[in-house]
Amino acid sequence: MISTVALFWALCVVCIVNMARYFSSLRALLVVLRGCDPLLYQYVDGGGFFTSHGQPSKQMRLVWYIYAQRYRDHHDDEFIRRCERLRCQFILTSALCGLVVVSMVALLIWH
């Protein structure tokens, strides 16, 4: 029989791997954004996005830009594809993180 604790840790590993994929895709999106739309790149603080002095309000602008699918009107097809991929990865990672939290609570109650 499969241990519930082992299953929980496997779920955590899958969640961490998907988070790494998400951040890697976000970094690649910012590189594409710098080339195709410098004003939007500056608007979302693309240069300081992954630094300690990054501005969270500008970072949230990019998150909401992608979440609201405002990229669909953009002129660059590669940028649109990367935004679609990033949006799907964000939804998947969010669902996995929620599942980890729910399973952690279930483990605490069960054991």
From Swiss-Prot:
Keyword rRNA-binding: no
GO CC terms, sorted: plasma membrane
Membrane in keyword set: yes
Protein's membrane topology: Multi-pass membrane protein
Pfam families: UspB
Keyword vocabulary terms for this entry: Cell inner membrane, Cell membrane, Membrane, Transmembrane, Transmembrane helix
Transmembrane segments: 1-21, 90-110
Subcellular compartments: Cell inner membrane
Family affiliation: Belongs to the universal stress protein B family.
Name of the molecule in the record: Universal stress protein B
Lineage: Bacteria, Pseudomonadati, Pseudomonadota, Gammaproteobacteria, Enterobacterales
Protein's gene: uspB
